[in-house]
Amino acid sequence: MRLRNGTVATALVFVTSFLTLSWYTTWQNGKEKLIAYQREFLALKERLRVAEHRISQRSSELNTIVQQFRRAGAETNGSKTALSTISDNTIKLLKELTSKKSLRVPSIYYHLPHLLQNERSLQPAVQIGSGRTGVSIVMGIPTVKREVKSYLVETLHSLIDNLYPEEKLDCVIVVFIGETDLDYVHSVVANLEKEFSREISSGLLEIISPPESYYPDLTNLKETFGDSKERVRWRTKQNLDYCFLMMYAQEKGIYYIQLEDDIIVKQNYFNTIKNFALQLSSEEWMILEFSQLGFIGKMFQAPDLALVVEFILMFYKEKPIDWLLDHILWVKVCNPEKDAKHCDRQKANLRIRFRPSLFQHVGLHSSLSGKIQKLTDKDYMKPLLLKVHVNPPAEVSTSLKVYQGHTLEKTYMGEDFFWAITPTAGDYILFKFDKPVNVESYLFHSGNQEHPGDILLNTTVDVLPLKSDSLEISKETKDKRLEDGYFRIGKFEYGVAEGIVDPGLNPISAFRLSVIQNSAVWAILNEIHIKKVTS
C-alpha cells in the first residue's frame, strides 16, 4: 500500500511539474510574441510617419514646378511658338496655377546659385547599385582620396560581416566618393565591384559620386577660427559632401546614420541601433549618437534630413559640421533668456547618446593632407555602466556628496552614472520638472557591474503633484501623503525602485528620492527612467 501511495505521489509530482513547465513555456512564448508584435507595430508606425512626410514633400515639389512654369511663361511672354507643343487643357491648367500671386520660397539654388548653370548639378555623375528603398536604416559613408592609406574596404567588411542575413535585406550602405576626377572614381568603383560584387547586385551596397558642377568655387573662402585656407576649403567641401549624400539617401529608408570610411563596428550593431530607435519612437528626438567622436554614428530620422541639409547649406562656408549640428539644436529648443544649463537640458532631449559606443575610429591618416589624427572612442570597449532613457526636462539637485565628477546632471542627461559618498538620513535626490508631466511609471536602478554593492538602501520614492489638493485618488493613495505635499509611492528594494504612478496624481511637478536611514555603503545610480504617459 505504501508503495502504491508513493507511486501515486511520484506520478502527481511528475504531472504537476510537466503542467507547470508547459504553462511556463506557453507563457514565455506568448510574451516573446507580444514583444515581437510591439516592435512590428512601432516599425509600421515609423514607416507611416515617413510616408506622410514624403507626401508633404511631393506637394512642395509640385509647388516648385508651378513656380518654374510661371517663370517660363513670363520669359516667353505668351509666345505662340513656345506654347504650340502644349495641349489646350495643359495651357488652361498652367494659367490657373500661375495666376495666383504666391510668394517664392528660397530653395537650394538661393544658397548655391551656381547649380542653375547645369541642369545635372544635382544628379550623381556615377551611380552603381540597384536603387533599393523602403529599408529601416540607410548608412552613409563619404570617402575621398587619401595620400597615405585608404581604410574603405576594411570599413565595409566590418559593417557587412557583422550583419545577419535578414538584416542585409533591411538596410542599404551608400558609399559617396567625394571626388570629381572620374578616372579615380572609376578605379574605386572597380575595386569595390571586385570586392563586394554580391552586395552590390543584391542592393545592399550602392556607390555614387557628384558631378563637378555640384561644387562652387572654393578658392576664395574666408579664413575663420584660426584655420588655414587649406583646412577651411577641406571642411567646406566636407559640408557639401554630407549634404549631397543626405539628399540622395533621404528617400531610401526610415533612419539615416552618418558613418566615416575609417571605422570598425561591434557585433549586433544593426539590431541594437534599430531597437533603440524604436524604443524612442514616441519621443521627439533629432539625433541619436552611437559614437562620441565627431560625426561618426549620428543617426537622423529621414524626414529631418531636409531641415539638416538646408541648415548646413545656409552656413556651409562658416563652420564645421559638428558645430552646425549643435547650432540646429540650439535654435530649436534653447531660450536666450535662460542659462546654459537649461539649454543643455533641452538639447539633451533632442540629442540622445547610446552607450557603450558601437563604432570605433581606426584611421590614423586624415583625409586632410598631412594631418595625423589619433582619435579613438574611449566608450567603445567600456562595459555598460549606465543605461540611457529619455526623461522629461528637469532641474536636478541632491544633498549627497558627489564622487569624482559623477554628477546627477550627467546621469539624467545620459552621459555618466551618478556616484555619491555614504548617504545619511535626510539626504535626497530631486528631479524638478521644467513643466508638469503626466507620468505613467518610474524606474531607478542603483549599483553597476564594477560596483554592484554601491546601492541605495532605505530610500523612498516621492512625487509632488501639481495640485496636491482636490485630487481624485483612492483612500490608499491619500494615506501616502506627506506633510510637505509629496506622496510616498514606492521604495528601493535590493537597490531597485520601480512602479506605476496613480493617474489621479498627474500631472507631476517633481520626483524625489528620500534617504530615511543612514547607509553603510556608497551609492551609485546608473538608470533613471521617468516614463511619460503616451498620447
Curated annotation (Swiss-Prot):
Q: What does this protein's UniProt record list under function?
A: Glycosyltransferase that catalyze the transfer of GlcNAc from UDP-GlcNAc to the GlcNAcbeta1-2Manalpha1-3 arm of the core structure of N-linked glycans through a beta1-4 linkage and participates in the production of tri- and tetra-antennary N-linked sugar chains. Involved in glucose transport by mediating SLC2A2/GLUT2 glycosylation, thereby controlling cell-surface expression of SLC2A2 in pancreatic beta cells.
Organismal lineage: Eukaryota, Metazoa, Chordata, Craniata, Vertebrata
Q: Which domain of life is it from?
A: Eukaryota
One GO molecular function term of this record is: metal ion binding
Residues bearing Phosphoserine? S474
What residue intervals traverse the membrane? 7-27
Q: What happens when the gene is disrupted?
A: Mice display impaired beta cell glucose transport and insulin secretion causing type 2 diabete. This is due to defects in SLC2A2/Glut-2 glycosylation, provoking SLC2A2/Glut-2 endocytosis with redistribution into endosomes and lysosomes.
Q: Which residues lie on this side of the membrane: Lumenal?
A: 28-535
- Activity regulation description: Inhibited by UDP.
Topology versus the membrane:
Single-pass type II membrane protein
Residues with an annotated glycan are N77, N458
Catalytic EC class: transferase
Q: Which reaction is catalysed here?
A: N(4)-{beta-D-GlcNAc-(1->2)-alpha-D-Man-(1->3)-[beta-D-GlcNAc-(1->2)-alpha-D-Man-(1->6)]-beta-D-Man-(1->4)-beta-D-GlcNAc-(1->4)-beta-D-GlcNAc}-L-asparaginyl-[protein] + UDP-N-acetyl-alpha-D-glucosamine = N(4)-{beta-D-GlcNAc-(1->2)-[beta-D-GlcNAc-(1->4)]-alpha-D-Man-(1->3)-[beta-D-GlcNAc-(1->2)-alpha-D-Man-(1->6)]-beta-D-Man-(1->4)-beta-D-GlcNAc-(1->4)-beta-D-GlcNAc}-L-asparaginyl-[protein] + UDP + H(+); an N(4)-{beta-D-GlcNAc-(1->2)-alpha-D-Man-(1->3)-[alpha-D-Man-(1->6)]-beta-D-Man-(1->4)-beta-D-GlcNAc-(1->4)-beta-D-GlcNAc}-L-asparaginyl-[protein] + UDP-N-acetyl-alpha-D-glucosamine = an N(4)-{beta-D-GlcNAc-(1->2)-[beta-D-GlcNAc-(1->4)]-alpha-D-Man-(1->3)-[alpha-D-Man-(1->6)]-beta-D-Man-(1->4)-beta-D-GlcNAc-(1->4)-beta-D-GlcNAc}-L-asparaginyl-[protein] + UDP + H(+); an N(4)-{beta-D-GlcNAc-(1->2)-alpha-D-Man-(1->3)-[beta-D-GlcNAc-(1->2)-[beta-D-GlcNAc-(1->6)]-alpha-D-Man-(1->6)]-beta-D-Man-(1->4)-beta-D-GlcNAc-(1->4)-beta-D-GlcNAc}-L-asparaginyl-[protein] + UDP-N-acetyl-alpha-D-glucosamine = an N(4)-{beta-D-GlcNAc-(1->2)-[beta-D-GlcNAc-(1->4)]-alpha-D-Man-(1->3)-[beta-D-GlcNAc-(1->2)-[beta-D-GlcNAc-(1->6)]-alpha-D-Man-(1->6)]-beta-D-Man-(1->4)-beta-D-GlcNAc-(1->4)-beta-D-GlcNAc}-L-asparaginyl-[protein] + UDP + H(+); an N(4)-{beta-D-GlcNAc-(1->2)-alpha-D-Man-(1->3)-[beta-D-GlcNAc-(1->2)-alpha-D-Man-(1->6)]-beta-D-Man-(1->4)-beta-D-GlcNAc-(1->4)-[alpha-L-Fuc-(1->6)]-beta-D-GlcNAc}-L-asparaginyl-[protein] + UDP-N-acetyl-alpha-D-glucosamine = N(4)-{beta-D-GlcNAc-(1->2)-[beta-D-GlcNAc-(1->4)]-alpha-D-Man-(1->3)-[beta-D-GlcNAc-(1->2)-alpha-D-Man-(1->6)]-beta-D-Man-(1->4)-beta-D-GlcNAc-(1->4)-[alpha-L-Fuc-(1->6)]-beta-D-GlcNAc}-asparaginyl-[protein] + UDP + H(+)
The cellular location(s) given in this protein's UniProt record come to: Golgi apparatus membrane
Q: In which broad location class does this protein mainly occur, judging by the first location in its UniProt entry?
A: Golgi
The pathway it acts in is: Protein modification; protein glycosylation
Entry-linked Pfam families: MGAT4_cons, MGAT4A_C
Q: Which residues lie on this side of the membrane: Cytoplasmic?
A: 1-6
Give a GO biological-process term.
N-glycan processing
What's the name of the protein?
Alpha-1,3-mannosyl-glycoprotein 4-beta-N-acetylglucosaminyltransferase A
Query: Which cellular component appears as one GO term in the record?
Result: extracellular region
The record's annotation in InterPro entries points to: Glyco_transf_54, MGAT4_A/B/C_C
Q: Which family does it belong to?
A: Belongs to the glycosyltransferase 54 family.
- Give the free-text PTM comment from the record: N-glycosylated.
Cofactor entry = a divalent metal cation
